[in-house]
Amino acid sequence: MNALTSMKCEACQADAPKVSDQELAELIRLIPDWGVEVRDGIMQLERVYKFKNFKLAMAFTNKLADAAEEEGHHPGILTEWGKVTVTWWSHSIKGLHKNDFIMAAKTDQLLD
């Protein structure tokens, strides 16, 4: 468990600030298995989780859906045979907010 998993997401409005470069450097250290991707100029967090079969991948996807609904923050999810790709970013600000790091940490916690 890290400090992020005990935090709650806050409502993110279009005028909410994106994480600064310094915040990004600090927060990414707390979720070392995640990478930063830039798509269409939008910074996103992404991780691929591996599973033994599709049923386990789907079970993880469903657990993630429940966690996302509970926090009111939703990822991009690609579920395939043996793997799930999860992408977090804040749509309203077209970039990364602290909520994305909180949810990345909570996503990792679902494996426990």
Curated annotation (Swiss-Prot):
Reactions it catalyzes: (4aS,6R)-4a-hydroxy-L-erythro-5,6,7,8-tetrahydrobiopterin = (6R)-L-erythro-6,7-dihydrobiopterin + H2O
Organism the protein comes from: Shewanella denitrificans (strain OS217 / ATCC BAA-1090 / DSM 15013)
Protein name per Swiss-Prot or TrEMBL: Putative pterin-4-alpha-carbinolamine dehydratase
GO molecular function: 4-alpha-hydroxytetrahydrobiopterin dehydratase activity
Gene3D superfamilies assigned: Transcriptional coactivator/pterin dehydratase
Keyword Lyase in annotation: yes
Biological-process GO terms, alphabetical: tetrahydrobiopterin biosynthetic process
Keyword check for Lyase: yes
